[in-house]
Amino acid sequence: MNRTRSRIIRFLLRNGPSTCGQIGMGIGASPSAIRRQLGLLTDAGLVQRSSAQFSASAEQVQLHAAAFEASFQVTVMPP
């Protein structure tokens, strides 16, 4: 996950449902960058959109993080 997406998720978890403009002002990113990243986060299920506001669920973020971590674990089989 890139830095902007991480900052968006942290912002939403701290501040609750927010508009694209509020997120951009909060993390210091352009509206076009925010919209692009919010689209990716929404498609991944990490962010939900309701009307003009976006929100993040701590539970969903934790589930995705655990799945991501598990995808990199290597299982060592005994000889």
Located regions from the model:
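Short, hydrophobic-biased segments on the C-terminal half of alpha helices
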Residues: 38-39
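A short, conserved structural fragment
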Residues: 42-52
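Pre-recognition alpha-helix immediately N-terminal to the DNA-recognition helix
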Residues: 6-10
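Key DNA-contact positions within bacterial/archaeal DNA-binding proteins
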Residues: 32
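Short capping segments at the starts of secondary-structure elements
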Residues: 3, 15-19
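A short acidic, leucine-rich amphipathic alpha-helix
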Residues: 22-25
